[in-house]
From Swiss-Prot:
Phosphorylated by MAPK1/ERK2 and MAPK3/ERK1. Residues 223-240 have a biased composition (Polar residues). It is found in: Cytoplasm; Nucleus. Residues 121-188 are annotated as: Basic motif. The helix-loop-helix and basic motifs form a SPZ1 specific bHLH different from the classical one. The lineage of its organism: Eukaryota, Metazoa, Chordata, Craniata, Vertebrata. InterPro entries: Spz1. Keywords: Coiled coil, Cytoplasm, DNA-binding, Nucleus, Phosphoprotein, Transcription, Transcription regulation. It comes from Bos taurus (Bovine). One of its GO terms (cellular component) is nucleus. GO terms for molecular function: DNA binding; DNA-binding transcription factor activity. This is Spermatogenic leucine zipper protein 1. Residues 96-148, 177-289 form a coiled coil.
Length: 371
């Protein structure tokens, strides 16, 4: 008989099958103990054929008992191997789960710090917007005063007909202020858009924190079940839990990287806004200086006196006023050149932001291909 080969190829027995095998073995032991009693109970006046058959039966029972003993040895060795393999598997799973939990806690702390930084930068942006609105109102008031003064000068002085360059510069200044207002409106829209993005990221951060809390609850439930004496989870459940944890860690890493990108974008926008505010301050001071230094308000009595003066004296007066007017135009030209520099800086920042966005897409594509 080839019983040992069958014992090697068959599947490992379950608990119910082991209990049945033990019952079968006990029954076989009892059956094996019967033949000598039956042989002793038989009368001595039997034939030799009958004794030969009994000897064959006894040999068969002995061989069966040996095979059963071998099977019992194999079963006990298999049980020992199973217990030895279960213990290191449990230890490795617990170690990996603890490492993943520590990583999740560290990433949660990093996300909290980034959210705090974003909120602080948004508060600074709101304050700067309020300052910009105040500066805009001051600029509008100064524009009104400049327009009134220019109207008085046009009505009172006749020498401005010989100065077409001054009129062209004034028209340039008038056309320049609406352009600044449009840029301010566009910057305000950008800040509102960034605020909406920050709110979206805060919502995603709350969802991630909820997922982490649910995972912690599940871990606590598993611990309670283990303490109550329930069966440990199988290998498939451990693998699924491990995959879920790895996916959560990947999501947290992607979220932290996107938060870093948003932080850099906000810093660039804040720098641009600071430069805008500085330029508006310079414009405001440049507007106040000619208003304070030059006698912009001319009375009707002075105009009457100028009309009475001869043309030679009028030309001398206009020649005296020419350097002051040229100084104001020079200051305005400097302001417009500073605006061009600011535009160039903004274009450089936009190129930098596009490079950052492209790198983020390149990083996300291999991650999606791997998943």
């Amino acid at each position: 008989m080839e019983v040992p080969t069958l014992s090697k190829t068959r599947k490992p027995p379950d608990l119910n099958e082991e209990s049945l095998d033990l019952g079968i073995m006990i029954a076989l032991f009892e059956i094996g103990s019967i033949p000598p009693v039956s042989c002793s109970s038989l009368p001595s006046l039997k034939s030799s054929d009958h004794e030969a058959t009994e000897q064959r039966i006894a040999k068969k029972f002995e061989s069966l008992l040996k095979e059963i003993k071998d099977i019992v040895k194999h079963v006990t060795s298999y049980e020992q191997k199973v217990t030895e393999t279960k213990e290191p598997f449990k230890e490795t799973n617990m170690f990996e789960v603890s490492e993943l939990r520590e990583k999740i806690i560290e990433l949660d702390e990093i996300n909290k710090e980034l959210v705090k930084k974003l909120l602080a930068s948004l508060d600074l942006g709101k304050k700067e917007n309020a300052k910009k609105q105040e500066m805009r109102l001051d600029n509008q008031n100064s524009e009104d005063t400049v327009q009134d003064c220019s109207g008085d000068l046009v009505n009172c002085s006749k020498g401005q007909k010989a100065l077409p360059e001054t009129q062209l510069s004034k028209e340039k200044a008038k056309h320049g202020f609406p352009h600044i207002q449009e840029e301010n409106i566009r910057l305000r829209n950008n800040m509102e858009r960034l605020l909406q993005e920050a709110e979206h990221w805060s919502v995603e951060h709350t969802e991630l924190s909820k997922l982490i809390k649910s995972y912690q609850k599940s871990q606590n439930d598993i611990k309670t079940l283990k303490n109550n004496g329930t069966h440990s989870p199988t290998q498939t459940n451990n693998e699924s839990a491990k995959q879920e944890l790895e996916e959560q860690v990947k999501r947290l890493k992607e979220d932290t990287y996107s938060l870093h990108l948003i932080a850099t974008l906000l810093e660039n926008e804040c720098q641009i806004l600071e430069q805008r505010v500085e330029l508006l301050d310079e414009l405001h001071h440049q507007k106040e200086e000619p208003l304070q230094g030059e006698p912009m308000q001319i009375n009707h009595e002075q105009s009457d006196k100028e009309q009475k003066l001869p043309e030679a004296e009028k030309v001398k007066i206009h020649e005296k006023n020419m350097p002051e007017v040229e100084g104001t135009f020079h200051k305005r030209d400097q302001f417009f050149t500073s605006l061009d520099i600011c535009h160039n800086k903004k274009a450089h920042n936009n190129q930098f932001n596009t490079r950052i966005a492209k790198r983020a897409l390149v990083v996300k594509r291999p991650a999606s291909s791997l998943s």
